[in-house]
Amino acid sequence: MNPQLARRPAATLLALSCALSPSFAAAKDLGEDDFLSRSRRLTYEGRRSGEGYFSADGRYMVFQSERRADNPFYQIYLMDFETGETSEVSLGTGKTTCAFLRPGSNEILFSSTHHDPESLRWQQEELDFRASGKERRYSWDYDPEMDVYAVDRETGEQKRLTNARGYDAEAGYSPDGEWIVFSSMRDAYERELSAEEQKTLEVDPAYFGEIYIMKADGTEQKRLTSVPGYDGGPFFFPDGERIIWRRFSENGLTADVWSMKTDGTDQRQLTDFGSMSWAPYVHPSGEYIFFASNKLGFSNFEVFIVDVAGTKEPVQVTYTDGFDGLPVPTPDGKQLVWTSSRHKGEGGQLYIANWNHERALEALAEAPPRQDN
């Protein structure tokens, strides 16, 4: 998904900016240095980069970046931490997003529209718009042509895993590599919508996003959620027993972190933060969850952690104005990669820092009980 706030109607955004309150206050004795050390920028090339995810051994990181001269949209890249080399994984055509490395395999998962015969036209239209000098707020369009693919990084062989009208993306493998969880908006295209639903689809297609699960070969696709509002950004817990994701409220004003069993049962709300809380990812220890939230200001996203049961108030991790989000720990839990605009550039870039796991546990133990909003 995009490394910024998901697109919302203007009226909703205005209401959200009014709804956010400064009631949350980070502990006075905590700061970014408590959790992060030796922060450094990983990506420099391109207009923007984000969403970095690791191979099981930590050697590779897959991410998305806008860096091709002939395509203004995200493409997928693989960074090798041993050699320092970065290579393009996707095909260079269309839009791509949300890559993930399959454990025990050379396969890389991502979503793409390269099969769309209109892809080159959309690319040229966007290139022409940017060349005109005009500007617009960055947004994500939830392209209904987006489908999930798996590509072998050695042979280049690709497999199309979904083929449904509607945005299929935000996919990740289970720890054993046998299952894939993803978000889909196919429901809006598979049935006849009411007049009100059709209007919603035209304004905010993300409203129809739901969580699905399937086998790694694309078979046995099953819907797990059926709640009005955008459900997306799912990942498996380290033990593979549960799924973490974020759920937007029906009116799109807020989002919170949830977890459930892999069959869709036992759905639990883990945050009640009264803001946009999204992009959750579980620490390898299984003891707490990283996520991003704009609790401190409409356009100021920071990284937070919350205990895995959601019994405590979240603890703030980053303290830098702008965008800090999409946090993902390395497989050994000793480092954290996230997307940030702290360099004051045009778009987000990837950063990495050493992670203080012990201090995180201490801070969560000291956090007050969760308050309902």
Label the model's feature ranges.
Residues 56-57, 103-104, 175-176, 238-239, ...:
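Residue-level detector of Asp-centered blade-edge/turn motifs that repeat once per structural unit
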Residues 20-28:
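Bacterial Sec-dependent signal peptides at the C-terminal "C-region" and cleavage site
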Residues 27-47, 79-95, 151-166, 214-230, ...:
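Multi-bladed beta-propeller domains
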Residues 46-47, 64-75, 91-96, 111-148, ...:
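A flexible loop/linker signature enriched in serine peptidases of the S9 family
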Residues 11-21:
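Bacterial N-terminal signal peptides
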